[in-house]
Amino acid sequence: MWTCPLCAQQFVKANQSHSCMDKELSDFLRGKTAHTLALFWHFADSFKRIGNVNIHPTKSLIAFAAKTRIAFVIRLGKNFIDIVFPFKEAYHDNLCFHKIAQVPGSNQFNHHFKMYYKDDINDEVKSFMKLAYALGINSD
């Protein structure tokens, strides 16, 4: 593991390209509705029940990382949160992702999940969270 000397984030690869920002998690959560905050913390707690997951605020999103980054909160709406799970293959046979898109020029498929209620973290979503975690901790 490599630790950035400027921001103290840890990465699998030395000199990993990233944005050293002074953003804090509170910068993203400030001014959000109680409902949105409850959704965010429920998602974070659900991931932490799976394994040791760190939360990394970046310039424009909130990353969740095991050994590598395994999920991203890309938007905190008024009554929802948008989450992306990056996988190396597309998992089309599901009911939870409203969009699956390949990142151009890569073998990464972003799986988009919109969470409106705490109950949206159902068994299917938990199975993808567990998969993301397992892939993250076993990455090279």
Please place each PLM-identified region on the residue numbering:
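Charge-dense, helix-prone N-terminal extensions
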Residues: 1-140
